[in-house]
């Protein structure tokens, strides 16, 4: 049985270099324990804030050693960080910048795929983040 550990907003823990070291070590060794560590954040930039840190204390290690990434919409200001990912080309980066709600670039060790997630109307009740779509849905329900 495999254990998956998902951490959201993990970058808030990166302030302390000792905590960074523990987190990075956990990500590096999880596979040996039949576990998988996942992290979620709003911007890839969060992992590049400590570029001068040693490898064992540098959060970018989590990204560069990941076997898979789901890259959803990023801001134009994040391009410089996306360009530092070896497995992305300019077309991939432009797709990520232009991605609409539910679109992402899936990158793993075997390749890349552009993914569009289409939510059912019932799923939109708890997963929608598009304010305009929510207004339209409310008008239709009324």
Where are these regions (language model features)?
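Conserved P-loop NTPase motor cores
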Residues: 1-95, 121
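Conserved P-loop NTPase motor module
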Residues: 1, 96-142
